[in-house]
Amino acid sequence: MIREPQKSAKAASKSSAPRARSSVAKATSTKATSSKAASSKAAPSKAGADAGAAKPRTKGLGKGVIAVAQPSFRRERALIKRGVWPVAGCDEAGRGPLAGPVVAAAVVLDPKRVPKGLDDSKRLTADRREELFEEICATAQVAVAYASPERINRDNILRASLWALTRAVHALPDLPQHVFVDGRDRLATRCESEAVVGGDGLIASIAAASIIAKVSRDRLMCRLAQECPGYGFESHKGYGVPEHLAALARLGPTVHHRRFFAPVAAAWRKIEGVPAEQTGVTGDLFETPVDAGIAATL
């Protein structure tokens, strides 16, 4: 009699176990469902947060175009704060063409009147370069020097370029205490020289010099176009474009061409032995000023 209630209690316990497990399973299922619902609700807010995150400003840029920071006056100011003044930047234009001089420029910017929009001349339009050229000349110390094609033929393009850069620095009204030069090579100047690779895109003074050199050379090539018609100097500025190569083959080279550059050398071989006056050659516009050591100060 005593054992029967125990059995029934045990049976009751066994019968209640499935219900307990069932309720636990339901609770787990309900918890999982609510968790999924919560996560599905949270997902849109996360996506919204990502969508609202700050993105690089690309206004005005085409698809796939990377924004490039403009050169700054920061490194010049750091030197000025240490008492180093004047600080110049220098650069050249025209190392790659088949004809015309290398033109070098040196610029000392006024710390209080640094033109806005300075940049590597290659990243500017021709009209913008002209505008900045006038502004730089009106507010800064500027000097320009030329290395003629004859000097390039004699010394090679690198040495002629460094020579012109050095001349430009020494032609400044006030000799700088420090000069930044674009490229890998320091200059043999009477002041401290610092080479900066890609400097025309980093340092404002070099960017200004690149603009002065580019505009000065472009103007000179337009003058050469009048002296040597038919070569198209006014459009390609002496670079080896198809139009220029065709003119070389048709008219032959002038003394403004760099004799040891391959396309020019080939053109000379075709007319070897022909006197210069029979090839349409005229005098070198830059030979006298360069050999006389004159660097024009604008």
UniProtKB/Swiss-Prot annotation:
Residues 85-273 form the RNase H type-2 domain. Its EC number is 3.1.26.4. GO terms for molecular function: manganese ion binding; RNA binding; RNA-DNA hybrid ribonuclease activity. Its cofactor is Mn(2+); Mg(2+). InterPro entries: RNase_HII, RNase_HII/HIII, RNase_HII/HIII_dom, RNaseH-like_sf, RNaseH_sf. GO terms for biological process: DNA replication, removal of RNA primer; mismatch repair. Gene3D superfamilies: Ribonuclease H-like superfamily/Ribonuclease H (3.30.420.10). This is Ribonuclease HII. Disulfide bonds: none annotated.
